[in-house]
């Protein structure tokens, strides 16, 4: 499958661009000197969050989990000692609320997204990024949240090997 994306120069000041996706959606891009839109490197993290987020929430619903709030955030570190300032480490945190959430269903949803379904995870993990896949289950007010790491993917992972049986200690 071929996906087409184009970027056109915005007729204005600064270095703003309008990105038009193959599905016809547009977004404003800017560099670090402006504030008109997202920086391209930020969009990698948005893509990571969106791709795994769709996978995980779909799996939770298929697993009959009642989710009252779901948020996925990605925090990443860039190297600063050399250019390009590539991402080297990221933490993907899935924060979930709901009555009687099954922790194992959540762990499995995150694992399957990270190893089988998330194209963005596969691409970033094949490159330079070590990605920590974590979750936090938020309970009723006053209760301590449950937090854990499901797995780590990358760096330099073979995208075809993601989802294959791993050595002892791997989550599934």
Task: Give the positions of each predicted feature.
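Alpha-helical metal-binding/catalytic segments enriched in His/Glu/Asp
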Residues: 48-52
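Extended beta-strand/beta-hairpin segments
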Residues: 1-46, 57-172
